[in-house]
């Protein structure tokens, strides 16, 4: 399952969905015209507000540092996140190319009025020819593009790098790690 979140303003929800629909439909048609069917599954959409510590009912609650729906201090109007889960089988022929092109669309299309973040529990950072259906193989997206959405504009004591340093301090021997997390959270 390839998945991304688009954090935007409530006023832009319809725009986000419309632009996705138009592109997704044209992407499928591009492959179909070549007699190829790299996508065989449903699209799951979810929308909700951004993290709000006041709703937690615990004194001194804070926003999770690397949460997808964490609000951005420079863009308070971006108060919702729409999750797009593309329920595709990675073994489907050309699924990695399809997902790569879709991710490229997300990262380029919405940049003027939204922030795109990965859904941590799903696949992201695609390359058209990588292992695992291309997921987690685009080093630039994995180590720069997505982490920067929690770096730029956030204070040094509450950003991506601070979270990585905290995780490293809590697990200095990398007991709770794997090759993917080692790439995502380098020492």
Give the ranges of each region predicted by the language model:
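Conserved glycine-rich FAD pyrophosphate-binding loop
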Residues: 1-187
């Amino acid at each position: 399952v390839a998945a991304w979140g688009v954090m935007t303003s409530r006023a832009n929800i319809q725009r986000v969905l419309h632009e996705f629909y138009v592109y997704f439909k044209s992407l499928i048609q591009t492959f179909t015209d070549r007699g190829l069917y790299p996508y065989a599954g449903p699209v799951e959409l979810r929308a909700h507000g951004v993290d709000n510590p006041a709703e937690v009912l615990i004194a001194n609650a804070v926003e999770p540092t690397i949460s997808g729906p964490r609000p951005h201090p420079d863009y308070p109007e971006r108060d919702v996140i729409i999750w797009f889960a593309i329920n595709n089988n990675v073994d489907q022929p050309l699924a990695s190319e399809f997902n790569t092109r879709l991710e490229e669309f997300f990262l380029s299309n919405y940049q003027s009025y939204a922030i795109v973040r990965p859904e941590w529990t799903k696949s992201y950072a695609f390359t058209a020819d990588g292992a695992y259906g291309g997921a987690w193989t685009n080093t630039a997206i994995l180590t720069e593009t997505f982490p920067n959405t929690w770096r730029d504009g956030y204070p040094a004591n509450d950003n991506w790098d601070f979270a990585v340093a905290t995780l490293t301090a809590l697990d200095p021997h990398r007991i709770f790690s794997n090759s993917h997390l080692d790439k995502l959270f380098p020492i």
